[in-house]
Amino acid sequence: MRQTADRLRRWRPGAIAVVILCAGLGFVAYEKFLARDISIYPDDEQNFKYGSIGNDGATGVPYAIWIVLPKVFPEYLPGPGGYASLGFRWEPGRTQSDAPLGFSRARVGVERMAINCAFCHVTTFRRALGAQLEFAAAGPGNTVDVLGYQNFLTACARDSRFSGDGLLPAMEQEVHLSWLDRLIYRYAIIPFLKKSLLRQAEQFKWTGQHERPPWGPGRIDPFNPVKFGMLRLADDGTIGNSDMLAVWNLGARDEVRADAPLHWDGLNTSVREVVLSSALGDGMTAQEYDKQTQASLRRVATFLRRTKPPASPYRPDPAAVNRGHVLYVKLCAQCHAVTGARTLTVIPVEEVQTDRHRIDMWTPAARDAYNHYRTGYDWNFSHFQKVEGYVARTLDGLWLLAPYLHNGSVPTLADLLEAPQGRPKAFVRGGEVLDSSRGGFVAPPCDPAHPEKGAFCFDTTLPGNANFGHVYGTDLTAADKADLLAYLLTL
């Protein structure tokens, strides 16, 4: 017994040391990999622009790495200017060291940069060339190149310089790293992120298959990634490329048609489900769907119900506006006015005759899979639906919704009033200078075979990019078109 007691006394200090060491390592592991701290914004608009949607741990890129990627790998960007070349924008008072619009900067172990709803839903515009940049929250993101960002991260991860030796010198010029930080980044975070980005690249291989055209700035295929990823449906070759949505003023729907779809795609009628499913599509996980994330998403929903589009800056000739209003009532109001009999209803694609690829992308199987999606949590989805057309939406904020049609295939309102054969066949997307005479953004013609470096040439002859259909008003006289355009510019 005495020998046993002696052995215990001799082992006790060592055992205590082991326990302390394990506890210390556990604490470090928790602090550097798991500890979560997200910023709380008192203002709902700031929360929409910069708040977390619960995807920081799953898809967020550590800030210390994210901030140096454009410096280490500039050749993988479409042009100079770092992330700005991908259409990212910073509000006044912020620098490129801060989070751009549409990114949360939250801590999950380390600080991470992750996209949020504003990544696709803030419009940036200038009233004239050289004028101050202005922002419209909840409008369609007209400059951001979502697939370009994904491809940039992929190209970086495939480069042999995506390593401790390749990244740490640049990182130490931007942020303070302790000796422990350097070890953790070198042997854990950088290798793990590289594998994660390469795995994500495999999940997006479908974007370059089946003759799918590139998205370009201000466009996205929002639901095929969900179909083939989260819902685990097979690649069916469909194309869902479409213009970014305006998501402002969702509460006004209740005044028009309470059970109507929320957007022109007709997919869902519930604000809660649209916000929640969007967060899931952007990488939110059940593990991060905690009270803070739930509160943030409720605030996003409230903001989208209440926020209004900015008033049109255009002041056309009042007489022309009055004449144009008469034409609008005759030709457009039935489907687009608040009091219209068909406003917020599904217009069959056979009638509107626009490109149907987006309709075919959303299959009954996808609808059913989303309504029954329960991975990790009972999300309680029940309002996803399949429609055979596009919803005729109200025209609030019309002056900022260019390019027009659901796939962004018509650059200006003036072009939309032309017969399809007279509309531009190819034009530059991603502009933010307003075209005050034609309605929309300045969008010069381009040659898809010889695009200008740094500019995205949108080719309407590619699958999913067609600019035909919606021929209402195209048979008016030139004078009547000018009057109708004058009225539309005020909306």
Describe the role of every protein-language-model region.
Residues D6-L491:
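Periplasmic c-type cytochrome electron-transfer domains
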Residues M1-T4:
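Short, Lys/Arg-rich, polar N-terminal cytosolic tail immediately upstream
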